[in-house]
Amino acid sequence: MNKLIISLLIVLSAISIISADYQYGYCKFGSVGTVNQNITGYVTLTAQDGALNLVYNISSINLPTGSYATAIMTYGYNPSNNTDLGGVFQVDGKGTEQCQSGGSRAGDLYNLYVNDNRISSNFDSLTSVSIVDSPNSIIGRSIAIFQESYSCDLLKSSVGTSVGPLTTVVASCIIGIGNSANVPATNGVNTTTGNANTAGAYSSLSNTQYDAMVLLANTTKSPSAAIGGSVLFRSSSNSVSVNGIVSGVAKSVHGFHIHAFGDLTTVDGASIGGHWLSGAQVHAFPENTSRHFGDLGNLCIFDNDFKNAYYYLSTSYFSFSGLVGRGFAVHAARDDGNTYVGGDRVAQGVVALIPKAATTLNQVPSNWKYEVICSNGTYTGESTIEPSPTPSTTPTPTETSQPGTSSYLAPFFVLILSSLISVILIL
């Protein structure tokens, strides 16, 4: 009997290992600041029943040999200053600046080492942060590389970089939900059928502290290399407003969607996956209550010069925290709300946490009429403005319907004059 129980426990343990969910995130670097260090590469983030593992694959042709601190930052992006990312991420406000340890801040990592314009592969294993729904989730936040190094670096005396404090960001990336199809085999997680990627942002993010934004950049599917702009997601207690301003797109209708993954592994837009959805949701237009969470319809309203396209929607259909860390796409053609979602993805980006936005950020004209189905094609916003009332051409009361004194005097004198003439003729 005891052997049977032990055997069952072994089997159940094996099943739990095989079917264990995992988390996968992806973070693609780009240079920031006044000096372009031409830093490229990415970080993969994986966890499965344990610590969060970060694996770096980064290169640079402009960084001198030395050591450079890395840290997880509070914001994924800051529209007013792309090097001010809100400071190193802290869960409880405790900790001091140092390499990851018991006394460090949650977001403090380690130093990267640069030699011959190559940043060496590095591996961090963390327990202070996660990429699953919890107060210490870093989905939607950023990883920054600093000009300075941590003082805990034993090699600091042999390199040219200065030792803290960490003030000068030279590169950063937005931590997005990764596409499971791209998990490197060397990352040590079991992605077999039945295991789900449960990465996500903290579901109780403060709507008084954060908004979210995606910066758009063209993909290799775009005929234009000049697509840009951004989409702002402004959070409130019971809704999310979506304000988009997009430049460089063709003068046509474009599908406009939130996608499942904030994963920029591929430059053609494929790695952001399908639309963000849950369960049995189907592709449809707003405000269909069974549609994908990511179905925002179309982008079709332009300014008079057709230089910028504008989008606006306020909805309570999806949560603010649910969209953080996901991908976003502008499509080449119109989404028909049925089987055709718009073809190639001509622009993409990752939804990042940002500080609570000023009311003027991504402010679309408030007197335009916005629609997202766009069945009649493109139009200009100015054409939707209600015309001002034109001055009335109806005669004033003193002119016609309510004649004044002068209106009565003229016929009266005519009558008197006619009577006098008649009397004279009789005489």
From Swiss-Prot:
<feature type="binding site">
    <location>
        <position position="275"/>
    </location>
    <ligand>
        <name>Cu cation</name>
    </ligand>
</feature>
<dbReference type="InterPro" id="IPR001424">
    <property type="entry name" value="SOD_Cu_Zn_dom"/>
</dbReference>
<feature type="glycosylation site" description="N-linked (GlcNAc...) asparagine">
    <location>
        <position position="190"/>
    </location>
</feature>
<keyword id="KW-1003">Cell membrane</keyword>
<dbReference type="GO" id="GO:0019430">
    <property type="term" value="P:removal of superoxide radicals"/>
</dbReference>
<dbReference type="GO" id="GO:0006979">
    <property type="term" value="P:response to oxidative stress"/>
</dbReference>
<dbReference type="InterPro" id="IPR036423">
    <property type="entry name" value="SOD-like_Cu/Zn_dom_sf"/>
</dbReference>
<feature type="binding site">
    <location>
        <position position="295"/>
    </location>
    <ligand>
        <name>Zn(2+)</name>
    </ligand>
</feature>
<dbReference type="GO" id="GO:0042542">
    <property type="term" value="P:response to hydrogen peroxide"/>
</dbReference>
<keyword id="KW-0325">Glycoprotein</keyword>
<feature type="binding site">
    <location>
        <position position="275"/>
    </location>
    <ligand>
        <name>Zn(2+)</name>
    </ligand>
</feature>
<dbReference type="InterPro" id="IPR018152">
    <property type="entry name" value="SOD_Cu/Zn_BS"/>
</dbReference>
<keyword id="KW-0472">Membrane</keyword>
<feature type="signal peptide">
    <location>
        <begin position="1"/>
        <end position="20"/>
    </location>
</feature>
<feature type="binding site">
    <location>
        <position position="259"/>
    </location>
    <ligand>
        <name>Cu cation</name>
    </ligand>
</feature>
<keyword id="KW-0479">Metal-binding</keyword>
<feature type="binding site">
    <location>
        <position position="292"/>
    </location>
    <ligand>
        <name>Zn(2+)</name>
    </ligand>
</feature>
<keyword id="KW-0318">Glutathionylation</keyword>
<feature type="topological domain" description="Extracellular">
    <location>
        <begin position="21"/>
        <end position="406"/>
    </location>
</feature>
<keyword id="KW-0186">Copper</keyword>
<dbReference type="GO" id="GO:0005886">
    <property type="term" value="C:plasma membrane"/>
</dbReference>
<feature type="topological domain" description="Cytoplasmic">
    <location>
        <position position="427"/>
    </location>
</feature>
<feature type="region of interest" description="Disordered">
    <location>
        <begin position="381"/>
        <end position="404"/>
    </location>
</feature>
<feature type="glycosylation site" description="N-linked (GlcNAc...) asparagine">
    <location>
        <position position="81"/>
    </location>
</feature>
<feature type="glycosylation site" description="N-linked (GlcNAc...) asparagine">
    <location>
        <position position="38"/>
    </location>
</feature>
<dbReference type="GO" id="GO:0009411">
    <property type="term" value="P:response to UV"/>
</dbReference>
<dbReference type="InterPro" id="IPR024134">
    <property type="entry name" value="SOD_Cu/Zn_/chaperone"/>
</dbReference>
<feature type="binding site">
    <location>
        <position position="257"/>
    </location>
    <ligand>
        <name>Cu cation</name>
    </ligand>
</feature>
<dbReference type="GO" id="GO:0004784">
    <property type="term" value="F:superoxide dismutase activity"/>
</dbReference>
<keyword id="KW-0862">Zinc</keyword>
<feature type="transmembrane region" description="Helical">
    <location>
        <begin position="407"/>
        <end position="426"/>
    </location>
</feature>
<keyword id="KW-0049">Antioxidant</keyword>
<feature type="glycosylation site" description="N-linked (GlcNAc...) asparagine">
    <location>
        <position position="218"/>
    </location>
</feature>
<protein>
    <recommendedName>
        <fullName>Extracellular superoxide dismutase [Cu-Zn] 2</fullName>
        <ecNumber>1.15.1.1</ecNumber>
    </recommendedName>
</protein>
<dbReference type="GO" id="GO:0005507">
    <property type="term" value="F:copper ion binding"/>
</dbReference>
<comment type="similarity">
    <text>Belongs to the Cu-Zn superoxide dismutase family.</text>
</comment>
<feature type="binding site">
    <location>
        <position position="283"/>
    </location>
    <ligand>
        <name>Zn(2+)</name>
    </ligand>
</feature>
<feature type="binding site">
    <location>
        <position position="331"/>
    </location>
    <ligand>
        <name>Cu cation</name>
    </ligand>
</feature>
<feature type="glycosylation site" description="N-linked (GlcNAc...) asparagine">
    <location>
        <position position="57"/>
    </location>
</feature>
<feature type="glycosylation site" description="N-linked (GlcNAc...) asparagine">
    <location>
        <position position="288"/>
    </location>
</feature>
<keyword id="KW-0812">Transmembrane</keyword>
<feature type="compositionally biased region" description="Low complexity">
    <location>
        <begin position="395"/>
        <end position="404"/>
    </location>
</feature>
